[in-house]
Amino acid sequence: MSIAAKDIEPADIPGNLQGGEYSPYHVFSAEEWSRFRADTPLTLTADEVQRLRSLNDPVDLDEVRRIYLSLSRLLSAHVEASQILFRQRTRFLSMSNETKTPFVIGVAGSVAVGKSTTARILAELLARWPSSPKVDLVTTDGFLYPNAVLQRENLMDRKGFPASYDIGALLRFLSAIKAGRPNVKAPTYSHLTYDVIPDQFQVIDRPDILIFEGINVLQSRDLPADGKIVPMVSDFFDFSIYIDAEESLIHSWYVNRFMRLRETAFQSPQSFFHRYATISEDAARAIAEGLWHNINLKNLHQNILPTRPRADLILQKGPNHLTQTVALRKL
């Protein structure tokens, strides 16, 4: 079932992705999308959802029931289809000892839009399928260059931009995952110290499903003049999700989150942002506004938002972080 563009207010639909004959997407209201969950069981509790959601993100059990159960069912269909294709291909190649590589799901979107909450909820729901798949979640934060490198290269004010990531390490990690290698190491990151943690890794050992979450995971790269092969992060994805919202909403969520962190995590003397915990509320808000306009808004316009049309599925959020529309790429 597809929804005609006239059935939904244009403001509720991401950019120019309105549903219709010439759109690459089917677009559904949240209510219509919720019907696709069919008999998918709700395997999370309200307390678990509260534990999984990020600071200042009010996603609750009703939102899981309304949006995430249908998404879980859709992803189950995609994983099953990939397994069928794998068996057919191994028969074709007479490779009976071949082991299927992980199904990789990319989750992209702006800072403060709710990527981490989406990724964590999906990881829990998928791990509780009847088949009990092994599900791992990795974020791109660990692939940022250490602060010492960013400071040396004058990139601290562009942290989160493509140049601030060790793309080579990131691509080597995904290549190893898709090659089916065991015990692949992913670097880890501390949001308290705002830096990569030296010599600390998350070990990923041949999961059935890997969720890979980060702001720029759908970004393309310029082709080199010498004609060398340049893989992109999204080349390793079997399915991709973009979390979207109006710019004004993301702006307010970012500032509100900063002010909440000022009262919580920033209070720790170990926090990179501890200096903001003791200044006035007006001064802190002014700093948050500056960080938004000078760094995060520019990154959104230049590097994140242009990748939205590359996603297989777009969750468009409205006020209170609740999903209003879902756009699913046509096959």
Curated annotation (Swiss-Prot):
- Keyword Cytoplasm on entry: yes
Q: In which pathway does it act?
A: Cofactor biosynthesis; coenzyme A biosynthesis; CoA from (R)-pantothenate: step 1/5
Q: Where does ATP bind?
A: 109-116
**Which reactions appear under catalytic activity for this entry?**
(R)-pantothenate + ATP = (R)-4'-phosphopantothenate + ADP + H(+)
Q: Which GO terms describe its cellular component?
A: cytoplasm
User: What InterPro entries does its record include?
Assistant: P-loop_NTPase, PanK, PRK/URK
Gene Ontology biological process:
coenzyme A biosynthetic process
Chief location: cytoplasm
| Keyword terms, alphabetized | ATP-binding, Coenzyme A biosynthesis, Cytoplasm, Kinase, Nucleotide-binding, Transferase
Q: What class of enzyme is it?
A: transferase
HAMAP family named among the record's database cross-references: Pantothen_kinase_1
Q: Which PANTHER family match?
A: URIDINE KINASE
Q: What is this protein called?
A: Pantothenate kinase
The source organism is Rhizobium meliloti (strain 1021)
